[in-house]
Amino acid sequence: MKLPIYLDYSATCPVDPRVAEKMVQYMTMDGTFGNPASRSHRYGWQAEEAVDTAREQIAELLNADPREIVFTSGATESDNLAIKGAAHFYSKQGKHVITSKTEHKAVLDTCRQLEREGFEVTYLEPESNGLISLSKLEAAMRDDTVLVSIMHVNNEIGVIQDIEAIGELCRSRKIIFHVDAAQSAGKVAIDVQKLKVDLISLSAHKIYGPKGIGALYVRRKPRIRLEAQMHGGGHERGFRSGTLPTHQIVGMGEAFRIAKLDMEKDYQHALALRNRLLDGVKDMEAVTINGDLDQRVPHNLNISFAFVEGESLLMSLKDLAVSSGSACTSASLEPSYVLRALGLNDELAHSSIRFSFGRFTTEEEIDYAIEQIRVAVAKLRDMSPLWDMYKEGIDLNTVEWAHH
């Protein structure tokens, strides 16, 4: 067993060896290294063929047309292209956008930028289980609403939004619907023939592919138009200029192919590990699971350990690679904005840890993690005067603290 144990799959996944093996064939003189846009010789044709194959593999996971897949540098760029691209293109029809407070920063900060440009953005509060209420969403819709952006699976708490119902609602009001599916692709079935979703952001490194490559699904029927954010040689049908990185694209395609093949197996594996971890800690006192337990992917468990400071718990769990919040915000000392939006107080939000597992996690590693968690939490609580007061039955909300 290799220490520290990697339990941060929601931040990034290791590249599947099958993917790495495939990528190596597209870099050197021995392989297919050409520029896919070089139309005058075989090196270019072979690279273009490899890109086309990958585009088909990605489209297959979504049941989409390969022509609806636009390559980007990752889900962050896809979010930017989808939100800014649609908002700007359709700004004559209205300047109102709806999203939720628990979205990824790539969506929230893009919406903030639109606000600086004169758009109006409504940020929906989720329910305490992390789900978005359809009636609240409908109530927020206006005649000048042009775009709704709601993520499929949350990166911190793993809850699955009902994008089918949200899509129906948006389509009935002729509003463009964007979904960030970085955390759901390969974990939950996505069928764009059934779902009324217009734009979908995808990432390779959350699905055992390489970092630095992603895609944006752009619906053709009804056709969605976007204003390009990256200008140049007009690659990707003008949506996104820049030489295509064949090796990364091939890696993403292979990762999506394997994900489609192994989706059920990966799901059951993650579910068994999730239940094992949950069973190992649920009898501990003052432990809460954040986010709905049924409407969520099994790859994620976000747990608050009351009366334990999250940072000290992370330090105590030095043999576990876990995070408090998402990788994009884990460097800040602010409590998770996602957990605050669910209504958790600062103390509970600060005492939460995200465990996320995947294809290469073993039962042995989970058992070791359970043992480490139980020891660390008990030790830290022993040092906490608040824990003593709680054990004595004192309601800490009624305590008057002295202000110096």
UniProtKB/Swiss-Prot annotation:
GO cellular component: L-cysteine desulfurase complex
The keyword Iron belongs to this UniProt entry's keyword annotation: yes
Major location (coarse): cytoplasm
Gene3D superfamilies per UniProt: Aspartate Aminotransferase, domain 1, Type I PLP-dependent aspartate aminotransferase-like (Major domain)
Keyword list, A-Z: 2Fe-2S, Cytoplasm, Iron, Iron-sulfur, Metal-binding, Pyridoxal phosphate, Transferase
Record family assignment: Belongs to the class-V pyridoxal-phosphate-dependent aminotransferase family. NifS/IscS subfamily.
Protein name as catalogued: Cysteine desulfurase IscS
Protein's organism: Vibrio vulnificus (strain YJ016)
Phylogenetic classification of the source organism: Bacteria, Pseudomonadati, Pseudomonadota, Gammaproteobacteria, Vibrionales
Gene that produces this protein: iscS
